[in-house]
Amino acid sequence: MLAPNYLDHAPDRLILLWQQAEDDILRDVARRIGKMDSLTPTANWQLWRYQQTEAVRKDVVKLLARYTGKSEAEIRRLMKEAATAALEAEDEIYYHYGKEPTPFEESTPLQNLLNAGYRQTAGSFSNLTATTANTVSGAFEQALDRAWLQVSSGAFDYKTAVKRAVDGLADSMPYVTYPSGHRDTLEVACRRAVLTGVNQTGAKLQEARMDEMGASFVEVTAHGGARPSHAVWQGRRYHRGGAVDYLGQHYEDFESATGYGTGAGLCGWNCRHTFFVVFPELGSPPAWTQESLEALNARDIEYDGRLYTRYEISQMQRARERAVRKWKRRYLAEDAAGADTTASAMKLRQARQSLADFTRATGGRVDSARTSVHGFGRSEASRAAWDVRHNTLTNAAGQTIIKVGKSDIKGPRNGITQKTNAKGGIDRNYYGADGRQTKQISNNGHGHKVEEALGKHGEHAHDYIFDATGRLIGRPSRELTDAERKENSDIL
């Protein structure tokens, strides 16, 4: 038997390995995209694009060769460790009831099952990584095409197009393609393949042990936050080989009740449940009662005025940890491409603060392994902090503002930028969730008659209006609201 918490963390070392591979690939791709600004409109775009795409494909193949050997060795180590842990826990039950199972190391059938599980798990993941070179180069090619179209159409300058392309790949570049056509990251594919392989191999070993010992009753483990289709059968007892009534108790059929043996059922895709042998005739008490199952999802942790289950709190923390990784990856990718890293540095600081505040409020602990990004060390952290200190400021409302050299109708999502205008005044640009500018606050009238007539000293606002295609169709000027005056009192 493998505990849900063991299964949750079993792939961690392997995931860290493939996260490093992802980060290496991303920086290489970003560096190549950054070379776009060296091209002229008359350059042979198609030839350059082909050369860069082929170079990415070859680089990915070389990098995968470096990681594959380490990956296979770690899968073998993990499978052996997990199998040993599963059978040690199971055999303790047999010993407790006076039974003598064959030692795992001396059992040829069990060793054969372990080796078969390793080959299947390593093989399935190897099949996925075999698609990585084409998946990554395809995503790179599409990003290049979008960036080139934005530049050649005049929609964006080189720097903006490069930054948008790099940020998009940092956030969502796929690395593997499943036979169904679904694409995913190496991290997600690794967790799914290894967690499923480890759990299924452990389950097959336990089944073989039960056959050896003539046992037929099992109890399924339970954990908080189980998906609804799994919550109905977790923590209960079943009979292998069909439903039975035994010693005044009804036992449902193990496979039909839990879906064991199917991808969507017990020990299936990403499932952290497993089972262990029980002997009702020998008086073995159930590990789970209805009360203890209900307690798994008790809302007993308070955060921000509401009560949450432990599972919900853990997922909220995971989301904040992913945000830290996201902005580290963006920072490194932008840095490799030679793009402006200020916005990412600022978002990283905010994400780190959000995670620290959350764990402090909920009594949790920051897991540095879940926020680490290969290549983002002390030096990068120091540079990111410098970016924030020297390229941002705070307004009267406590909002962080990015200092820029020029205004643009596209900017940081839900962000604010500031520049000095031609008349020596200050313009603050506000952006919505889609990165489009929503308004501009200026502390002077730019020397324009309409704006100079507004406010006390020409201070005014422009609202930005776009049509359905995203084209700017108007920026009417108006008086500042009381709230806007208060928020921007530091420049008025």
Outline where the language-model segments fall.
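Short, charged, low-hydrophobicity "junction" segments
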Residues: 205-208, 296-302, 408-414, 430
